[in-house]
A protein has these predicted regions:
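P-loop NTP-binding core
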Residues: 1-187
């Protein structure tokens, strides 16, 4: 883990960015013993250097491949971002089913930390409809905080910064700060 860990502009935050080194993880897992392949990431995260962190956040691709499976096996809980768009509901359904299989086979303590509606646009009927469906089907899991569609959230990564450092006063950055407070208050 130490070889891929990078310091960030925030002294209390380290990151393992996607890189060429990470690209090799999926084939490595695919080639591993079938009885061990789901636990590779969990084993790496239980190394002594990981113990110095209060939280380890795994940002997974929007697929249910080996990387996501390994993250679910290693995780205590899952924060699920859901774009307020139609197909996102189908993806959420698949993820929930996958989480149930992971609970049964490898990680009985895995829970949904919360479902985070993202890219919400109150002027768009579909956005509003998706948010209503989320609250209807997951009344206890949907965060109060909703992340709006926001230009800053799209621009910040191209400048190599998180939104809160790129433009802390933007609606998008403020929304993520509200989310952090909500997680800390209830987590």
């Amino acid at each position: 883990m130490a070889e891929v860990l990078k310091k960030t502009a925030l002294p209390f935050l380290d990151a393992i960015p996607c890189s060429v080194a990470m690209a090799g993880f999926e084939p490595e897992v695919a080639g591993a013993d079938p009885n061990e392949r789901a636990n590779i990431l969990k084993e790496r995260l239980t190394q002594p250097e990981s113990s110095r962190y209060d939280y380890i956040i795994l940002d997974c691709p929007p697929s249910l491949g080996f990387i996501t499976l390994n993250a679910l096996v290693a995780a205590n809980s899952v924060l699920i971002p859901v774009q307020c768009e139609f197909f996102a509901l189908e993806g959420l359904g698949q993820l929930v089913k996958t989480m149930e299989r992971v609970r049964q086979r490898w990680n009985p303590g895995l829970k949904i930390e919360g479902i985070l509606p993202t890219m919400y646009d109150k002027r768009n009927k579909l956005s509003t409809s998706v948010l209503e469906e989320l609250k209807k089907h997951f009344p206890d899991e949907v965060f109060s905080c909703v992340i709006p569609r926001n230009v800053t959230l799209g621009e910040a990564p191209s400048h190599g910064k998180p939104a809160v450092l790129y433009d802390v006063l933007s609606k998008g950055a403020q929304s993520y700060m509200t989310l952090a407070k909500e997680i800390l208050a209830y987590g």
